[in-house]
Structure formats: structure tokens, C-alpha cells
């Protein structure tokens, strides 16, 4: 190219000379080739090197050929590491070299973070040698290898580029100009040219001017040396010349700076001066195998194939094959693994079949592989000899892997088999032994203790007197659970799961994983793929799983330098939420793995990580991210402190904490300041999360691991900051948050010390003992037990706890009782024996069981108090019912009787110390014993209980209580009046005697117990049911939500009972008029409350409320008292009655208005009760949710009182649900066997028999979706049964979005030695792995019929009609067979056409002959058996190709007449393949008719009849692309049934089998169904229906659930019709008030409502003109205007089709016709009339669309001709003119008939209407005068004209038919005047005097024409009469005699109309 300097390059030249390339910027300052970066519109960024020619004569053709050869060589066989120039262009001025642009070259990459690791440098050197090997193999040599020409991608893949074949091979050594111009492009003066390429000037250049591979080896050696020297070049130009002369050597630098001696020798060998001593690239790779391990070859082949996949597939492939890749890199051997994978993927018989097992499954080797293994061993001998060292080193590693590899000797195989058998035995060994469990738990506790000790050592804090620290360190380990497992064996917890979770979560003794070298090569590949992933799930899997697994096998430097920064980038706000969550968790795991790091990384938390995470604690961050951040905070804090301690150890590894000098103190000051800074940062994060966030879940997460945070903050900061922050959680209403506080507070106590424990934490625990939620109380007791076991409580506090908690031994909750027992045992263990005897035993004695039945004494406790002994001696607890009553009673009335109760319990001999009941705990003088074990006070207390607490005490006055016992009298004399009133009140509210005694013992605890339901009880006074029975009125209030029973007690006339528990009890005992006041207040409340529709509906559904059965017949009675008395009873007061008998004969139930809700049941005593509108089951601790049953309750229920005081409102009670036993909801109900419950069938079940639940079925109104669908909750064992009875019961989510995987891919790694082009095989499986919704029920698809035998295998249609021939009855003009002509369905040839058809001959209509007819019958068959686009069975023959089109018109020829229906036929539907059509009738049947039989004969019968549906069938719809029909009944039911078609009969007719029901949908509550429709999508098959209550509902047949529920506005009127868009985008409804509502089906919202008519909207029809601009147009049949065309998009009317009367204009008198002519015309008319035979058809129609008032009468049937239009009778005109000469022109309103049927055939520019006038009219809107009557109906219409006009004000067209018969009063006239059948053209303008004569002449011609047609028609009628006389069948009428309700069109065998009327008649017309 010459040693010339190029002229300056102008950037504009670029686009002018080489096309669409835009200059971006210059690259470098080279003089020989100017390099620029440019942008190509199609290829992206490119590099263009420009050579500026010196003159235009200079030619570059030689170099162009060389560059093209290089390009072609590498393009034929793709090379992985070569990037040649892609394009070379030569112009007159320049030459251009173009290749792809890369962001980095090797020189730039060496100075870019993250820096290359040693293994990455080796892999780059390996790729460079491979690139040189590839180019040498092609005979191509580079000539200028340097770091600038080595391109590096983001995945660290290397390309060798810029082949310099155009540069000189040899340059002079004494002239640096050539070197600077050609080779020193970067200006660094680095020189990597081989020494032999320099020559002395005096000797001249060598004659051989070609490059050799040895030259490139030297240059590559220099590049590899620069790579390992981190960018330091070993030669510049002067040094290379000195090295050539032997004056300089780079060996010292290489030996000093490169640590690996193998790399040193490799570089020194490659840069030898003698080229003959240099090796080839492949020999360097094989000889230096220690530098280039064997897995490099695998990675070099695997990574390029991986890069060809999509980004998501790359990540999935690495993740799926991660274990195999690890094995390859770990063992440095890939051959055996490749063979295993190859066998698995190809199923080869010559290699052996192995199943590669997962780590959790054993390895199996098939027996038929022995011979193959021998062959493999023989074949592998050579490899073993060559790689003995490697094989020996890798045997141990192979034995430890879980993937099967083929070994080289039999011994190794036997060892593996033995090891596999041992693994199988270990996997099959049970792990449920108690000894193993104890060891596992002990291991957990030991690890926890080790963690605590290490943390305390870090904090320089010693915790004394801690022998066993059973605290929770992770969220999954619960100390109470561990203790419960060790002490008892009653729990069902999976201990293996606990052990597994504990091992996974404790990171102190984490199992070390061996570092696998080389895996970091995939990090860059993964990062590049994840950056451009399409699916967030791929990122989640990569960040959450793949990177963590890689981090476990990489070194610490790689974790900190490469993995942590990338994970931090995935936490940025630009990433999806789930990706950020997984990134946070992975960050904590990876940082915890780091054990060693340089000192500079010690501040990574304070300077990098925490500032980057600062935005996560902000309120705007997603809640799930904040929760994940709170979850990892303790882990991050512990890791941060460990980093600081490791850094401190590096600063002074020998001091061991002894600060002897200033230097040491300075080091520690650095540590303290760094720790303080990090602590402040972490506390700010914790404070922001806890104070700025109201999410309780986040607070629970922090509490679950609060101990590690406390250890991190230290004692001082925990006391000052953390403890006050978490104590505020106790003020929260969420009881689960309070539970979490007490679950984890013990660990905090170990950090804060005894002072903070007694001052702050202990009082909070005492308050929790009386918490309203019993879960909290149980957790508080557990925390006290832990504190006692740790020895953190002093003796006075222990004694105080004994006093406070001993009364709780009588608590009805077993969990609380067991917690108190555990606490007392721990207290006893901390006290001496003397203290136990003096303090503990007296305190416990009153709560022990009474061994002597006469009350002589309680049980005596042994000296050693254990949990088992104490539980056995405890007295039975207070019943749950009594406990709830007394707690609410005390809280509501604020009773404080502590001193009075103590005085009752006191006596002279053995004093009960009052201090035992006081809240100040122990202390004070006196005997601390509560009761002596054998003292007499116990007997007195028993006597007091037996004699004082009796029901008769209520009848006595307060001052006159008599007793026969002197002891009782003395006790009563000491009691106060207030205490006596309290005792009476306990009896009055229904507390038993035994419970009263226990209540007195634990009164102090009950007095301080909080009552959660107090507020709700006070607000429920209005929930009352009034019952009158025999003059006695009982008002029952349901304010007790825990006990919803309703009972009564017999009361005497002199006794009074409280009416409401909110009233003061003293006033209740002395005032009997409170009930009247309550009634007045109740009436006022009722008048103020509004009754909503939802509450009213739900109230009607509830049949049982509080034990009272209401409804149509009430069967509940109450016991009658002796005298009429008004008594108000609380349900809790009534529960103690003994004589309750219910009978329907004596009860008058007055139910209060529905606005007063009646509480039914409560799942848990502390929760809000369930109301009537919704059932909201909150989350519980156990995770199980109790759902009420849906079993129906009996309408007649007997309620009685048994011995257990339980009321059973069904014949049998259900057993306890096993799921409830494991639920935390049952904790409140773990009480004794005394039960007061109501059980309705099977439903809500508590844990034992002592439950206060109401099991009812009145939970049917839970809203499970946005459509307010009524869904019943049911138990899991009842779902199947209930769904069979009522399939609409439960909405089940059948398909989860996460399961809808589109494809699944499997990846296989194959052996590269097999000679395959790729080693990565990807199998994509779409069919087997797609998870779709439930299959659609068998609806009889039309496609299945095609393969079922209806068509021949060749697809050629047969002839149904057969050949024509013969005349019918010899009548001329009707030639051919009636059914002849037209091919049909079946095997055979296309049937030949007959000689014409009906109406043929010389009629002038269709002069067809031979193959003629209406539609050339011979061509109407199947054309080659193909199907049309609409899914029809019929082919694209001429008969269907032209159907329907703009030229087709119905002729009005009657083909068939059916009269099988006994009532009105409401709707007709034709199947999509035109095999059959169906009719729905008011007689409750749906009949199926065969379309193929229509032209065979007039008399046909229905093929099938469906009569299994109740009520009238109002609408039907044929399911799309199926043979199933959806029929709707006025009873609110929809049946979907399948029409069975099983093939073809011998005569060619289709064979119909039985009908089968597919689905029954019963929606009686939604109203009568007006119309039904069906549509299908790719994922659903929806039956849509509208009801009279304004609902539009969709039921999905595939998922068996509601697809949508829409509600039309009731103010718009009742829905009369609806129509669905064929594209499923919109839906329109029409109402009785003329309103049209358009709905958007995609979003389920109403778009608008507009009034289109003042009358009713009767029907919709789609506008079917193809490819019109009016796709949103619809036809609407209305009352006022017969038919309008409405544009839904513009909300306006575009056309109107109407009929009206018009007053005739004034006309000149006409000359009368001669009498002879009048008589002649009249005689002709009479003859034409007499030619017809009249039939009478009468019926009683009950059709509900407005035809109930239509009169049915006998009338004469007139003949008709379809093409003769209405004509005028001249005599009639004259008579009208004569009669109207002297009359006044008065316009009288005359009603027009309603249009009830609309039809717009596809692609036809006309509309067909029918309705109350019994006529079928065709409206041609393109040519209105061409409109005519297809059927003239019962009587001919009068004279009419067509009128077209434009309404300019409303902008729509009016197509009007104007009637001029002024003598007729309405369209329902019974005159016998003949008006014409329809063959002629009607008058298109109104009459005028100037055109009267012309009209008369036209009328005469039309009359003659009509008479001729009537003669031909009469011949056909005569033929039918003859057939009638032969078959004794009544002659059918030609036209409809009743209003027509529907018309449809079928296309096969010929296009024909189907019409149906209210008398049940169905007619088919040509």
C-alpha cells in the first residue's frame, strides 16, 4: 500500500462513498489507517478503517482479494475466536475496512473493574492459543498480534481481529519510521514483532515476504506476558532490538512478577529468539496442561453454544446443569460425564444406560450394561495410561459426587456400588426415634450457645449464671416448641423439619464447601444474560439461587469483588419487586460466607452497603421489600461486626486485647469508632422501619431475630434505644404482634440485664397475664418460665409470680393451665425445699382436686413438685361458658368485691390471708398459707357452696336469708350486702354451683382480666327477637357473642330477672319495669335504622338465629309460666333452664325488622363475631382456617335441653374436625367436657366437646371475587358432594397463573469427542408441559363428525336427494323430483340434478331443465370433501360458495311445515355446519330438525326432542363450533346438552343418537332468564344469559365457575333482549323502557346508556354486511319504530324501517267502469278466492313477550306468490273514492304491528322482518321498491307504497311502507279482500290524479299476472289435498296464522328461511 501519509479524512465522505453509515467519533491517532466509530442503520455500531489513496491510479485489488479469502475461510467453518473484516470497499479516493464494533480490547479490559482473576487470565490465554490454532489451520496468519487487536466481550470472550496481511512482513531495524507508521498505532511504543522480522538495511529485506506461524507465536507470547503482568509490556521497540542482539532479557521481570512457574516457562518458551524452538499452539495447550486444565476445552466449546441461546435460556441452562458443570470443573475430567449424558439423551445401546440421579436420590445402574462397561474399560485404557496422575487424583473426588461416572476399573465400580447401597440404607432409615430427636434438639441448643458465647466475647460482656440458654436465634426455632418436645411427646410437629431448618439458618458453624476453581468463568456469562432477560422469574432464579450456589464454591475475593457488587445492582429501584427481595436475601447469605478479606474491605458496610440500602427503609418502597430488608438486618448486623473484628485482628494479631501502648489504644479507638458508626447506621434503619412503617408483619420479622440485633448494639444501646422502641408494640391491637414480643423477649432480657428486666420488662409481662387475648397470656407464661430457668428473676419476684399465677390453674384454657404448671415447677426448682413447703404448697392447695367427697380436704402435694404430678392433682377448671359470663359481667359492672370475698372465705380457725388475693404479691406478716390441707375451713367452704349457692336464694330478700347451718349463718353475718348481691347475680346469670366456688377462689384474677367483647356487647342491644307464647313475651338479646344459644328458664311470679346485662344488677333485682323501657328504646332504634336490600336478602336466608327457627312455619316454643308476665331474658340467663319444650302449636314469633343484625357465631372468643353479610376468617397462628359447613339445616327443628345443656338443632351432631385440632384457633376451646353448644349438622367444629359454636349453613354470601358471587364455604370432605348437588356452590381457582408454562426445555451436555457440531443439546417440549385449564366438556365438536364417517375417505360428497325423474301427479309445469337436485352428505358421487324443481316449467320464474332448479341442484353438493372457513361440514361447492350473497332472495315457496310443538316456538337456532336446526317452545321442549330432509317431503318429524328441563324454554343458543345447545327456562335454569350424531345411514341420511346432558346451571335466585347466548375463546367457553332482575351473567363451561356478573341499572327497565359482539368486545342490552346499555366485556363496565325508543326494545340482530364501515351497527326492533339501525360507536340512529298509515289525498272523481267489466273482474276475484281451501287453527298462547292479548280465530288461508307485490282492486278504489266524496278527512291513529323477528343474512343487503302481522317482509335498503313480502300471512295487506326520506334534523334514513287502505282500522282486519301476493312491483310514490290511469293499467296487468301464478300455485295445493286424502293428514296452511316470533336461515342443502309462530308451527321457505 506504500509508505505514504493519508490526506485528512472528512467525516462527510463516509456516507457519500460507502452508503448508510453515520460517523460517530475517531478512534486513536494512527497515521496509516484512520479508524473511526460509525453507526449502520441495520448492523448497529461498526468500526471503519480508512486508507486514503495518494492518487486515483493506486489499486487495492490485491489486498481486497487477500481480505476476501480470509473472510471466506472463517465464514465457511465458523471459528469461535476470530473476527475478520466483514466488508471491504474501494473507491476512487479511499479504501474502507469494516467490522463489528467492540467496547473493549484486552488493553482496556486489564484496567477495568472487576479485575481479571487468575483463572480468567488463563482462560483468555487459552482462547488466544485456540484462535491462533484456528487461523493456522486455515493457513491464515495475523502479522500484528498485540493487546489492542484482542477484542474482549462483556462475557470475557476473546476475538482476534485486524489481520494485517496488508502490512509489511519485514521492517528495517535501523529505521523506526516504518515501525511507527505501520505498527505503533497506539503510540505506546510497545513492540511485539518477532525478532526475525527485522533486517539490516545494508543486507536488504529477505526474499520470502510471507508470514509464518512462528512469528505469531512470539507476538502472542508477548501479549500473554502483558496479560499476566496486568498491562505491563515486556518489550518496546528499543528493548526488542536489544533482545534480538542479546543485550536485554525480560526473564527477570517475568520471574519476579508472575507467581505461577508454569506460566513463566510458557511465556519464556514462546518468546524465544530462535523460531524453530517455538511450538505450535496446540502443542502449547497439551504440554502445559497444568496451566490450561481439561475443563477449559469444555468451557471453550460450551460457552459459545450457550451464547446462541436466548438470555433467559442461558440462565436456565446453567441452573439446570449446574451440578454437572461443577463436577466437570471439580474433577477436571469430562469424558465419563459426557458419556453418561449422551446415553441419557440418545438412548444408545452401545454405550450403556445410566440414570443420572439427583443429590437426594440413590444412583442406579442397570444390569444390562455389564458387557458395555467392559468395552468402555477397554476403550479407555489408552486414556488411563496417558493420564495416570489425573485419574489417581480424581478417584476420591469421583466417589464423593452424586452423579454417576463410568470408572476405569472394576474395583472402583464395586466401591461405588457399596457406597450407594449405604446411602440407600441411610435414606430409608427412620428418623423418628426419641433418642435421635433429643440429639437433634441438643445440637440446636449447643449451636445456639456457641453463637451466644462468641457474640458475648465480641462485645466484651459476660453473662453470669447462664448454664442453659434455650433462646430463639432464628425465626424458625421456637423455645417453647423445643421444651414441649423434650418434656412431652404429645405434639405432632415434624422434628425432622425443625432440625433441617435449624441447620440451614444457623450460620456460625456453617459447613464449608470446597472452592471449585474455574466456576467464576460463568459469572460474566450470567451477568450479561440476566441484564437482558425478558422474564422476571429468570432474574429471581438467578439472583436467589444460582448466584448463591456459585458463591458457595468460589473464594472470598470473588464473592466480594464480583458477586456482591452485582447483587447490589439488582436491588436498584429499576428492578422488579421480587428480584429486589431475592437480591436482599442473597446479599446477606453471600456476605455471611466471607471469612477473609483485605483490610481495605473492612469498611464495606459503612461506606458501601448501608448507604446503598438507605432507600429501602423509606415509606415509598414496596412493603414486601421492606419486610425482606427487616428480615436480613440482624444477619447483616452480625456480619458487619464480624468484619470489623477480623479487620481489628489484622491490625494487631498478637495483642489479644491487651492494650499496652498508645499504638494499641489507637487501634482499638479506630475499632470503637467504626463500630459506633455502623451501630448508628443500623439503628437508623431499624428505627425507620419500626416507626415509619405501620406494617405489623415487618415488626414481627424484626422481633423474630431481635436477639442478634441486641447483641450487635450492646447492652447500653439496647437499654437506651432498642428496648423502649419494642415495648411500644404492646400497645398495638394486633394480638399476634404481642405474642411475637413475648416469644422473643427472653433473648432481649439476657442482653439488657436484671435491672432493665425488673424495671421495664417484668411489669409488661404481668400485664399480659390478664390480656384480652389468651394467646398472649400463654406466650407471657412461656417467657416467665424461660426467665425462671435462666435464673434472671429474684426470689421476691418468684413468690409474687406464684401469687399472681396460681389462680390461673382454674382457667378454662388448657394451654394457659399447662403454662402455669410449667411456671410453678420452674419456680419450685429455683426455691429451696423450705420455701416450697412454706410458700408454694399453701398457695396451691385451694386449687387441687378434693379427694374426699364430703369436702374434708384437698389433695396433698409431694415434696418434689413435677409437671406430671401437679397436672394430675389439679381441680377441674371453670367452664368456658361460666368464665366468659363472669368476666364480662365483672368488666361491664366494674365490680370490686375483693375484701368482701375474702371475708366470706375467712374463718376463726384458719384465716385466709388477705394478702393472697391482693395485687401486691407476697409480703406482709401472717401465715402465707391459703388453706390447710386438712383444715376445717375447707369443709366450711364446701358447705357454703352446697347450701348458699342454690337457685332458691334468688327468691329470698337480701336481709332474710335463712339457713339451717350455724356455720353458714356465721359466715353470712360477716359478709356485706354487696357480696350477697354478687352471689345472687352469679346464680341469676346461669353459673353453676361448682363454678361459683372456683370463681370465688380466683376472683382477683377475674377482676383484673380484660374483656375484649365488652364494647361490642354494649353496642348489640338492638339484636333482639321478640317471642310471644300464651301471653308471655320474651325479649332475647344476642349481645353475648360467645354464647349464641337461646334458652329460657321458668320463673315464678314473685321473682325478677335482669333484662339486660348492661343494666346495674341492684336496680334489676328491685325493678320489673325495665323491660318496658327497653322495648321503647328498641322501637326507637328500629325506626332510625334503614333496611338495605343486601341485609334483607341475607336475613331471609338465615333460618336459624340463636336457637330460634324462623321462616314460613315456626316450630319453636318456650315453656309456659303459670301466669302471664313480661320477662326479659338474656341468652346467657336462659341457658340454665330445665324445662324447655318447643312446639309449633303455641308459638307466635314476631321477628324484628331485618335491619337489626343477629350475631350467629364466633370463631374465637376474642375476635369480632361474624355478621350476616360476609364471613371473614382471619389468619391464625396455626395456619388452619375453620370454615362453616354448607349442609342444609332442616326447616323443622326440635330444640331440647339435654344433660349437658347443649342444644342440637339437627338430628345428629358432627364429630370434631381433625384440622381444627392442629389449628391455633382451638386454643380458646381446650376446656373440660362440660359443654353448652349448638350443633347444626356439620360445620364449625372446635377442639373438644366444650365449645360454644353454632354450626349453621347461613354463610352463603361470602364474596370470593369482584363479581359479588354468592359462594358457600364448606369443609374439604364436603366439596365433592356439594358440587354434585349444586355445581354453583364454590368458586375454585382451577388454574394458577404460575402453572401456565408455555414451554419446557431440557438441556444435555454431550461428549465433544463424538465429533458432533455442538456439545449442548436443547430439547423444547411444548405439548407435554403446557398446563391448561380443565378440558371443555364433550360438546360434540363439528370437527369430530368429519372423522366419524359422515364423509368418505376421499372426501367426495354423495347424493342425498337422488336423481330426478317423473312428474308429480302428472301436473304440467312442475317437472322433476321435489327433493331432486343437489349433492348431499355421504359416500358416492355427486347426485345428478333432477329436471327442475318446484316452480319450474313455464312459470317464468326459473325455466330450469336438466340440471336446473333454484340453485342448479346438481352442483349443490360437496366439492372434494373440503370444509369452508366457518367450520361447516360442507365443501366449497357452488351451492355454498354463492350462499348467501347479494343476488340471493327468498322466493316464498313453502318447503316444510312442522306442527309438533304444542305451544309457541320462541327461538330457532341453526348449527354452524348446517346439519340441523333447533327450536325452543313454551311446551318445555327443544326439538332437533334435520336440515337435509327439508326438500325431500313436506311432512317431516323432529329427529330428537329434549324435555328434561322444567318450565317454558325462553331461549336457546348453539355452542360455537360444537353440536351442543344451551337452553334457558323461565324457571331460572340453563341446560347444556349435546346432540348425538353417530354417522350416516344407508340411505344417506344422518343418524342421530340420544341427547346427553353436559351441564345444568340453576340460578333461581337471579330471576327468570330472558335470553341466552354462547361464545368461545382460546381459554374459555362461556354461556351468557340475561335475567329479569337486570343481571347479565357468564358461566364458563371449562372452569365451571362464573366468568363475569354484570348488573343493569334497574331504573332503565327490565331487560328484554341482549346481543354480544362477534369479536367479544362489547355487549348491548335493551330494556322495557327503550334504553340501550353498552357494556365493555373486557373490563366489565357499562360504557353508556341511551334511550333509543319510547317503547319496548323487543329484539337485537347483528348488522352482517361484510367489510362495511358500520361494524358497530345493530338492528333493534322497537315498539314505536318497527326497526332501527343504531350505531353503537357514535350513539345515534342511522336508519329506520317502519310501516304506517297515511290518509289518501284528495282525488278527482273517476269515471265508473262499465258494469260488465266490473262483474268480470269481480268474478275472477271470486274464483281465485274460492280456489283455496280454508283451514282453522286455534290455540291459546301464553307467550310472555306481549302476545298474551292476541286473539286467535278461524280465518281463510289465501294463496300467495312470492314475487307478486300488493296490487289494488279497481272496484275497491272506486268504492273508496265514492264513499269518501262527502266525508271529512280525519286522521285516526292506528297501531302498527310489532316486529318480533329480525334476520340479516351475511353479505346480503337486505333485512327480513316478521312479527304480529303474521307476514314475512324483505326490505331492500339499496333499492327500496324491490322490497316485497315473502309470506303475506293470514290475510293480504292492503294497498301500500314504499317511501324513502332523510331526516336531516336527526341525520338518519327512513325506509317506510305506507298503507293506503283507509277502510281498514288496523293491521289485524279479517276482511277477505285480496291484496296481492307479491310478484309485481309496488307503487314507489303516492297516488295523484295525473297518474291514476297509468296505475289502473299497471294494476290490471299485475292482476292478470297474479291470476296466472295463482293457478300454478293452486295445482300444487290440489296435489297436497290429494296426499291428505290418502294419508289422512290435515292439510297445512301455507302462511302463518299466528304472530311470528323468530326467523333464521339455513344454507344447506339450499338457502332457505325458517320461521316459527306462537301456535307452535315451524315453516321452511325457499
UniProtKB/Swiss-Prot annotation:
Residues 362-407, 916-937, 1036-1062, 1106-1130, 1190-1263, 1699-1743 are annotated as: Disordered. It catalyses: L-seryl-[protein] + ATP = O-phospho-L-seryl-[protein] + ADP + H(+); L-threonyl-[protein] + ATP = O-phospho-L-threonyl-[protein] + ADP + H(+). GO terms for molecular function: ATP binding; protein serine kinase activity; protein serine/threonine kinase activity. Its EC number is 2.7.11.1. Signal peptide: none annotated. HEAT repeats lie at residues 558-596, 604-642, 717-754, 756-793. GO terms for biological process: late endosome to vacuole transport; pexophagy; protein phosphorylation; protein retention in Golgi apparatus; protein targeting to vacuole; vacuolar transport. The keyword Methyltransferase does not apply. One of its GO terms (cellular component) is late endosome. Keywords: ATP-binding, Kinase, Nucleotide-binding, Repeat, Serine/threonine-protein kinase, Transferase, WD repeat. The active site is at residue 144. WD repeats lie at residues 1460-1499, 1508-1547, 1564-1605, 1610-1649, 1790-1829, 1935-1966. Gene3D superfamilies: Leucine-rich Repeat Variant (1.25.10.10), Transferase(Phosphotransferase) domain 1 (1.10.510.10), YVTN repeat-like/Quinoprotein amine dehydrogenase (2.130.10.10). The keyword Cytoplasm does not apply. Residues 21-303 form the Protein kinase domain. Residues 367-407, 1106-1119, 1192-1263, 1703-1722, 1732-1742 have a biased composition (Low complexity). It holds the Pfam family WD40. SMART domains: S_TKc, WD40. ATP binds at residues 27-35, 49. Belongs to the protein kinase superfamily. Ser/Thr protein kinase family. This is Probable serine/threonine-protein kinase vps15. The gene is vps15.
